[in-house]
Amino acid sequence: GLFALLQFPMTIMVGYRRAQTEIPFLDGGDATLLRRMRAHGNFVETVPMVLLAMAFAEWNGLPPSWLWAGGLCLLAGRLLHAWWTLEHAWGVPRAFGMVLTFLPMLGFGGWTFYKGLV
């Protein structure tokens, strides 16, 4: 539920900018719209798969402390990445946000893959 609540304002921000600029499709060369689209798009491209991997990891017996740690990494990573992407094109905080997203993606995915082998 929390990640759905995080996605909602990003969706609204894209729609609002589209209304302001009267750009119905793509980014029309508007840098602000492009940043908003990419912040939203990157969220949609990563969060569902990590949450699915998290659910499978839980189902396969990953201890709750690891689930919480991975979930908090994902939350922090998505907040940091979205905040920085909306304000700047590139930077260390944005990259760190992706690292915090990749850690649970690899951890939950790796655990689930391992448990499928044994």
Predicted regions and their residues:
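Cytosolic, membrane-interface loops and tails of multi-pass inner-membrane proteins
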Residues: 12-38
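Interfacial loop-to-transmembrane junctions
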Residues: 80-106
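Core segments of transmembrane alpha-helices
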Residues: 41-54, 105
